[in-house]
């Protein structure tokens, strides 16, 4: 009887985590670049009541008898599918149509950040020195040349520059003050990972490379990395219909486990009453 209560308690805890994951997704339904999560369950230990036996001469075998001891959180997976692109018309809003990740970091300009973070939230307003930054002030890491060539660099727009544009190849160019040919300030760089689901959330739309993600592979937009769409941002990939379904599932699972506890408690109460 106590087994049933402990199993139900583990079910309550697991379904509470499921509801927590669902709530976080719904709360971020309009967060730029947000990636939703999914929780899976797995069973806990099982207590063996009777061992199994192999068939013998003149008789068949028998299966073991085991009683499960509840459930637990199996995994919380990051769902890295792309979100819808929302047109903003802002020159410094950039969305990725593909699998790449923007590379950002903190440093003292013009030094390139050594500790890198990754994001899909591509709203990059320039700071007072003209460097492209995130909303949190992290520098956008670019490349001095397209594709696999060049080295890492920060992307700086010259003071007074006009006609600023960001191309599908990640190139950031502008018309310098006083005229003359257009200047390419750099190329927005993108990173890919063998297992991008292993990236770890840092908050503020940033991610870190987890130990199971593999090394970053850097390039500029193009190919499987995706192209950059200027004047747009990637919205959250949260599927509200799926999240509401998960919410109902978590609620009903929580209620069912609560009923198990109530039933076991009533049985214990009946047993106590028999003793009186």
Give residue ranges: language-model regions.
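Amphipathic alpha-helical polymerization modules
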Residues: 1-152, 159-276
């Amino acid at each position: 009887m106590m087994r049933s209560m402990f199993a139900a308690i583990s079910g309550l805890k697991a379904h509470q985590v499921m509801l927590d994951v669902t709530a976080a997704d719904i709360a971020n339904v309009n967060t730029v670049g947000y990636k939703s999560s999914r929780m899976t369950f797995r069973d806990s230990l099982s207590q063996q009541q009777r061992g199994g036996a192999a068939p013998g001469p003149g008789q068949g075998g028998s299966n073991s008898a085991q009683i499960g001891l509840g459930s637990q959180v199996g995994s919380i997976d990051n769902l890295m599918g792309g979100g819808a692109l929302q047109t903003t018309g802002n020159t410094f809003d950039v969305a990725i149509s593909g699998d790449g990740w923007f590379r950002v970091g903190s440093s003292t300009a013009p030094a390139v950040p050594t500790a890198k973070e990754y994001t899909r939230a591509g709203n990059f307003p320039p700071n007072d020195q003209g460097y492209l930054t995130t909303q949190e002030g992290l520098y956008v890491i670019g490349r001095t040349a397209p594709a696999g060539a060049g080295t890492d660099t920060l992307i700086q727009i010259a003071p007074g520059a006009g006609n600023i544009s960001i191309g599908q190849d990640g190139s950031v160019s502008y018309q310098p003050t006083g005229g003359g040919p257009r200047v390419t300030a750099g190329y927005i760089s993108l990173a890919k990972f063998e297992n991008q689901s292993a990236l770890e959330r840092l908050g503020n739309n940033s991610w870190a490379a987890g130990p199971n993600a593999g090394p970053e592979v850097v390039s500029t937009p193009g190919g499987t990395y995706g192209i950059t769409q200027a004047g747009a941002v990637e919205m959250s990939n949260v599927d509200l219909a799926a999240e509401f379904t998960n919410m109902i599932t978590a609620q009903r699972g929580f209620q069912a486990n609560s009923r198990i506890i109530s039933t076991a408690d009533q049985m214990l109460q009946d047993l106590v009453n028999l003793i009186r």
